């Protein structure tokens, strides 16, 4: 998993609340169990005018040329609500997104994102609104997300602090998923197992 320290990237916004996981990645695309290949189906029902995905919706932000290559997504409150499918952060990451900035997140989606290297950043309504306004005002507007200092820097240079549990921050900074975190303690685990075997003799 790619470590996340500081990322500066083009921002795109979906100015909506309660964006659920079925909107992020509809259920008909969940048959695969590997992480790759879901990006093409991200927000399928919003990105396309047809079921086959052949007719892009020109009104949807992710299809607009000014947002092509965006790596930071802005949204409103309760992002990632609905079912607990891990495919949602898979699709967002596979599309090329590194961070989601919103007013709030559904708990399960929040945890799944961290476990898959996608940084969820919760800011206040006013802060998210300012970011959206600045991004809308200037094509190519970029946002910086600094996990080392837990700060977001807007296109105009305004700084907003955010919080993240230290355990989650450690995993993202070091590119560790749950398995990687366990393996990082392999020496201690081996020492403990050796000690246990000694007790059983």
Swiss-Prot record:
SUPFAM superfamilies: LeuD/IlvD-like
GO molecular function term, any single one: 3-isopropylmalate dehydratase activity
Pathway involvement of the protein, from the record: Amino-acid biosynthesis; L-leucine biosynthesis; L-leucine from 3-methyl-2-oxobutanoate: step 2/4
Keywords assigned by UniProt, alphabetized: Amino-acid biosynthesis, Branched-chain amino acid biosynthesis, Leucine biosynthesis, Lyase
Uppermost EC category: lyase
Source species, domain of life: Bacteria
Annotated GO biological process: L-leucine biosynthetic process
GO cellular component, one term: 3-isopropylmalate dehydratase complex
InterPro entries: 3-IsopropMal_deHydase_ssu, Aconitase/3IPM_dehydase_swvl, AconitaseA/IPMdHydase_ssu_swvl, IPMI_Swivel, LeuD
EC code: 4.2.1.33
Pfam families documented for this protein: Aconitase_C
Catalytic activity entry: (2R,3S)-3-isopropylmalate = (2S)-2-isopropylmalate
Function: Catalyzes the isomerization between 2-isopropylmalate and 3-isopropylmalate, via the formation of 2-isopropylmaleate.
Record-stated family: Belongs to the LeuD family. LeuD type 1 subfamily.
Subunit structure, as described in the record: Heterodimer of LeuC and LeuD.
PANTHER family assigned to the protein according to its UniProt record, in alphabetical order: 3-ISOPROPYLMALATE DEHYDRATASE SMALL SUBUNIT, 3-ISOPROPYLMALATE DEHYDRATASE SMALL SUBUNIT 2-RELATED-RELATED
Listed name of the protein: 3-isopropylmalate dehydratase small subunit
Protein source organism: Shewanella baltica (strain OS155 / ATCC BAA-1091)
């Amino acid at each position: 998993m790619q470590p996340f320290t500081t990322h500066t990237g083009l921002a795109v916004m979906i100015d909506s609340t309660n964006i659920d996981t079925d909107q992020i990645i509809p259920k008909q695309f969940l048959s695969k169990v590997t992480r790759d290949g879901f990006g093409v189906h991200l927000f399928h029902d919003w990105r396309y005018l047809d079921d086959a995905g052949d007719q892009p919706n020109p009104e949807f932000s992710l299809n607009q040329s000014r947002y092509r290559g965006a790596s930071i997504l802005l949204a409103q409150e309760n992002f990632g609500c609905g079912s607990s499918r891990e495919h949602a952060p898979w699709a967002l990451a596979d599309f090329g997104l590194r961070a989601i900035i919103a007013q709030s997140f559904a708990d399960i989606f929040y945890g799944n994102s961290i476990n898959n290297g996608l940084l969820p950043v919760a800011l206040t309504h006013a802060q998210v609104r300012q970011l959206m306004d600045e991004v809308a005002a200037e094509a190519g507007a970029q946002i910086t997300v600094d996990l080392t200092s837990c700060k977001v820097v807007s296109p105009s240079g305004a700084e907003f602090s955010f919080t993240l549990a230290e355990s989650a921050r450690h995993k993202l900074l070091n590119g560790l998923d749950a398995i990687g975190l366990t393996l990082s303690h392999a020496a201690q685990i081996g020492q403990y197992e050796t000690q246990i075997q000694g007790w059983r003799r």
